[in-house]
Amino acid sequence: MLRFIPSSAKARALRRSAVTAYRLNRLTCLSSLQQNRTFATQPTDDFLTGGAADYVDEMYDAWKKDPNSVHASWQAYFKNVQERGVSPSKAFQAPPLLDYADSYTALDSSLINGNNYADIDVGIYMKVQLLVRAYQSRGHHLAKLDPLGINVNHNRPSELTLEHYGFTESDLNRTIHLGPGILPNFREAGRKTMTLREIVETCEKIYCGSFAVEFTHISSRKRSNWILSHLETPTPFRYSHDQKIMIFDRLSWADSFERFLFTKFPNDKRFGLEGCEAMVPGMKALIDRSVDEGISNIVIGMAHRGRLNLLHNIVRKPAQAIFSEFRGTQDPDDEGSGDVKYHLGMNYQRPTPSGKRVSLSLVANPSHLEAEDPVVLGKVRAIQHYTSDEASHEQSMGILIHGDAAFAAQGVVYETFGLHALPGYSTGGTVHIVINNQIGFTTDPRFARSTPYCTDIAKSMEAPIFHVNGDDVEAVTFICQLAADWRKAFKTDVVVDIVCYRRHGHNETDQPSFTQPRMYKAIAKHPPTFKIYTQQLLQEKTVSKAEVDAQEKRVWDILESSFESSKNYKSDHREWLSNPWVGFASPKDLMTKILPSYPTGVNIDTLKQIGKALYTLPEGFDAHRNLKRILNNRNKSISSGEGIDMPTAEALAFGTLLEEGHHVRVSGQDVERGTFSQRHAVLHDQSSENVYIPLNHLSPNQASFVIRNSSLSEYGVLGFEYGYSLSSPNALVVWEAQFGDFANNAQCIIDQFIAAGETKWLQRTGIVLSLPHGYDGQGPEHSSARMERYLQLCNEDPREFPSEEKLQRQHQDCNIQAIYVTKPSQYFHALRRNIHRQFRKPLVIFFSKSLLRHPAARSTIDEFDEKHGFKLILEEEEHGKSILPPEKIEKLIICSGQVWVALSKAREENKIDNIAITRVEQLHPFGWKQMAANISQYPNLKEIIWCQEEPLNAGAWTYMEPRIYTILKHLGRDLPVRYAGRPPSASVAAGNKQQHLAEQEQFLNDALL
């Protein structure tokens, strides 16, 4: 069947000549009845090259559906080419009787319909189409976007000139039929023709006014046409009197709030919104439209710029609370250390004009720009999970508010964009709003990015980009509503770029004229947005001067009243919380009460039942033969109760939690199989490639198990999982690094959110970081999770032995937990312990790659039952067997993790019987009481050695040394504490296998001999 090949972004990148030749060849293939003929590109074929080829496609598709839907000239053109074999390069040329009469026939007179020849001049029609297309693709270059008028592009693209198409002034009055490619929506509205002058004026109004759009990078014709249908209309938007009054009211609040703060606190940093106040009515319009379209939950992320304004006017934080924070009158209390006012989060059930309510959540954020982006999306995804909205994305959405410099420069922006369409991560589209004040602190855009627009990164995801002048409040409102409509229609990202300015410096104490004198001279003369809009409404007679004055006075009086009440305002830190956990221990309870611990063991019959479900394949499932062996061995270990390994223990932990009703989510690179082929949580049929997830087939009433291979991102994905963990305490959320070495790509999330989020923002999380760690001779990038860095983040004081009360509160008071276990049962209990509490804490697991299958790392099923739980340390088990009893031990080696296996093996091979080895399974919070009791059982010790695989400047030595000395002081014992491990090293590990082995032999000798 004859057809044109639809154009795409990829096709445009091909050489134009090749594309043209291909299209011409396709055009002249008359099904199977006529021999294919390829035409070389000729000078007269210019209308078939470049962007024009897109229109040939559009015209042809329209003609095939309904010949009368296109202009008579197109009808003649396609009929001549397809039915009469006329060359595409000749079919449109004058005169109507074409060359080579023996081959070509005249244009079908029945298609002319009484029009004169000018009416069917396809060349003219094509040129007008190209002109319209040029406005669609390049009109934004001429749009009046800069409120200050200092960054105006005076270089008009040649494609937007009449001369480019051979038109002259005399052609402006030429009548052009509207239709496909030339303002078709106007034709549908009843306008059949326009003069060329009217077409140009209409395109200028649509594409070069106070808003503009970039959409030609979108490969989907359906989506592109959606944009055209909303913009290429006689009136893209027109607000009623009442709607304008609402916009006016919302803008007045945004304007007055900033002016009030500037009046009362002129020397305080507030990172005001002056210059972009239009964002507030725009955001409110976006929220209202989204709610009308079915949204009931919105999670918002933004940096400092305008945050206080948004907190008050959109998320409805009481003004007196904000003023109280400026005053600094709040007393320190026991609910965390707090953060600056423009970092705090907030939750609010907001009513909308339609009568519906929406749950708004503004997440807390650090000053690390854009770091909150993936956090927001993770939280949205979690809400969608708990509301059964993961497939439709109709109820919950995210809004991210960016700064122009950060949006263009921060890599996490791209990582976050990259999640938008991934299974397990998609949230159905995010609305991105850029507060584009055309400066980054003191840096001009030309030094801050390498692209024309700060939003160009969004093109890689085919998101439409709407630019809008921040001084045109109604245009901002319209574009924000249009963004909501796009998200509703296509469930993909959309970008709103509000081009504005920053009236003051980066903060209000800064002097911006040092570096941007021209800009700030213009700003000094420029009226505020509220004044501009007020003047517009006065001219329209929408409002009177008296009404304007009354509105300003009303808002100011309310703010003044709030200011007075702020003097005695007592903060309720619950207003900070961006994730209230109803029915769960509050941050206050956590700080003041000793909460009970719950058992983590499970009935053996239950374990065996789960094990059978885990390792029994469905009938007819063709698993890989090696995998069958692995699954059979794991099943036998559970049924026999002997030799349970680490992966099996993990599966049992997940399975028992699922059966108890706790959602489990595991995410990271290659987690479905496991980096080390250890997990096999997702099984692949070798014949059909269908997948089977045993953990989702335990019982009808189990909770949901989700495991997803992530994109090759650490920062973005860990931020996403952290956000996911905030939504509910009733879930075990695990992020696993491919190797622990790569987790430092996400250091910002670890430092600013996971380790400090609860202390700063009362933002609680039980996220689990699973980090492969261990020196196995694989070199400096596959050996270390940088244990020392996590331990440095821990908030415990090593200088004093804790009181009994502090020991009971250890896990409540800690900021993170860090473990390095050596037994599968320990792994099992640690995972379950993280859920079986009335509070949540981050858990960092350093897991040994070599212990995943090591015979020494095995547990019996009895160690998983109700009588057992997690042990902070594991004492020596060989007393009276291969080594002497405790009273005869002279040397105690304390270690953590897989080095225990090497030490035990070397001790056995060298027949050493006077050295005991104690394993620290939990590094933080430290097992003070347990370690003191362990040391006390050795009365004749001569020395204590801390042994580790890591170099001296890495690992746990600097963490452990002061704690061991504090314990010895507490016990009243004076013993030397010695280090045995690798020497200091700039590189994490040796890349040479022989050097690795030599270093290991050396520190084992140091420890044992």
Curated annotation (Swiss-Prot):
Amino acids binding thiamine diphosphate: R305, D404, N437, I439, Q669
Transit peptide per record: 1-39
Major localization class: mitochondrion
Record-linked InterPro entries: 2-oxogl_dehyd_N (IPR032106), 2oxoglutarate_DH_E1 (IPR011603), DH_E1 (IPR001017), KGD_C_sf (IPR042179), ODO-1/KGD_C (IPR031717), THDP-binding (IPR029061), Transketolase-like_Pyr-bd (IPR005475)
MF terms (GO), sorted A to Z: metal ion binding; oxoglutarate dehydrogenase (succinyl-transferring) activity; thiamine pyrophosphate binding
Top-level lineage group: Eukaryota
Cellular component aspect of the GO annotation: mitochondrial nucleoid; mitochondrion; oxoglutarate dehydrogenase complex
Compartments, record wording: Mitochondrion matrix
Classification via Gene3D superfamilies: 3.40.50.12470, 3.40.50.970, Multifunctional 2-oxoglutarate metabolism enzyme, C-terminal domain, TPP helical domain
Regulation of this protein's activity per its record: Catabolite repressed.
GO biological process: tricarboxylic acid cycle
EC number(s) per entry: 1.2.4.2
Catalysis performed (reactions): N(6)-[(R)-lipoyl]-L-lysyl-[protein] + 2-oxoglutarate + H(+) = N(6)-[(R)-S(8)-succinyldihydrolipoyl]-L-lysyl-[protein] + CO2
Cofactor dependency: thiamine diphosphate; Mg(2+)
Keywords per UniProt: Magnesium, Metal-binding, Mitochondrion, Oxidoreductase, Thiamine pyrophosphate, Transit peptide, Tricarboxylic acid cycle
Binding locations of Mg(2+): D404, N437, I439
Entry's family note: Belongs to the alpha-ketoglutarate dehydrogenase family.
Role description: The 2-oxoglutarate dehydrogenase complex catalyzes the overall conversion of 2-oxoglutarate to succinyl-CoA and CO(2). It contains multiple copies of three enzymatic components: 2-oxoglutarate dehydrogenase (E1), dihydrolipoamide succinyltransferase (E2) and lipoamide dehydrogenase (E3).
Name under which the protein is recorded: 2-oxoglutarate dehydrogenase, mitochondrial
